[in-house]
Amino acid sequence: MKQYETVTVVGAGLAGCEAAWQLAIRDIPVQLCEMKPMKRSPAHHTDNFAELVCSNSLRSNELSNAAGLLKEELRRLDSLIVTCADKTQVEAGGALAVDRTAFAQSVTNTIKNHPNITIIPGEITEFPDGRVIIASGPLTSDALSAAIHEKIGKEFLSFYDAAAPIVTAESIDMTRAYLASRYGKGTPDYINCPLSAEEYHAFREALCTAEEAPVHGFEDSKVFEGCMPVEVNARRGYDTLRYGILKPIGLPDPKTGKDPFAVLQLRRDNAQGSLYNLVGCQTHLKFGEQKRVFSIIPALANAEFVRYGVMHRNTFLDSPRLLDNTYALRTEPRIRFAGQITGVEGYVESAASGFLAGLTTALEVQEKSSLIWNRQTAIGALACYVSDHTINKFQPMNVNFGILDPLAYRVKGKREKNNQISARALAIIDSIKERIAL
């Protein structure tokens, strides 16, 4: 068997593990560098790889949803992250949610047991020689950030993500809550906590006036919309919450048969159903304030909080000025970046960037012809978005149909149009799968 050059991957998060896996299964030796367990970022709590620090949901599974399309593309292309997610999923209606501990352990064990992957523990503070994929994440250490800054000659852009609290299932007052999924889709997997107009008013007022934990450099204007702290959301207007994360439409209270004034949904956080997270309630309030404010919700009056929400720094590159559509540094193509540091936002999006970076590097090492990735697939559309030099003010982006090429013909109905875009994408993915078959 031919001996290929070793590729270094920095960071064993979702993107780094996916990149390492795509290289390793193609017989390319990988050095996977991870600073845990020697050092952890402020948002990490375990020594596992691919630790989920925000929600436990990988979002919709439906092909009429761009997140569902992206997962299906990766699933067909033998993604490690999606495979492990499928194995450790918990009930969540039409979404793919996972038992976060089982998921991380599954990824960790798979990576550690592959003979082509060598784990190098410890913090990386400078660029390794040879081909390298930097997947150090949104919480890149100060030392590596300095090395990247010196290499690219550009300033990073920074913002902050927030994680939601988790409560025990047994502490939820089910006499004041009910099980349902919106519009009755799928199985009734969410616990719904209704609020009257008076209760909503009290909850919102408490949110707006609660004391926040100190966060260096935090500014409301820099908060990414997809992971906005609930208290920042509340300040934007009286009805912002009830038209957003507390939207009651499609969730009638079985006691009245009518939609409540507002509803907080709780989503299962582990396979056993013993833990639930507060959907959309990412926060950076002080811990004591979190308990006080969320206990205003009747069903959570006596809730036991096993994890409070935390706020953490997120750092990403001005990628359109730096990267090509394979995530390679234009000025030094031996270097690729992957994951949220590139400006893709979300778990599956991070895995997708790691997949493309790892696969493309593997093809280069093996001196095989490269693939053309365009906006007709979700994987390609993300790569094209982060490398689009026409974007003046670059901001992180979740996958969405707006970044994919539209159809060349008109289709009646948004859902059907999206389904046809997905069908086109998956046909392309199937042809790619044939070309890269192991």
Label for each model-derived stretch:
Residues 63-67, 71, 79-92, 152-161, ...:
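A short alpha-helix-loop-beta-strand transition element characteristic
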Residues 3-15:
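Beta1/beta-strand and adjacent pyrophosphate-binding region of the FAD-binding site
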Residues 278-282, 286-344, 351-353, 371-387, ...:
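A glycine-rich dinucleotide-binding beta-alpha-beta segment and adjacent secondary-structure elements
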Residues 113-287, 291-292:
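Predominantly flavin-linked oxidoreductase catalytic cores and closely associated redox partners
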Residues 394-438:
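C-terminal auxiliary extensions adjacent to catalytic cores
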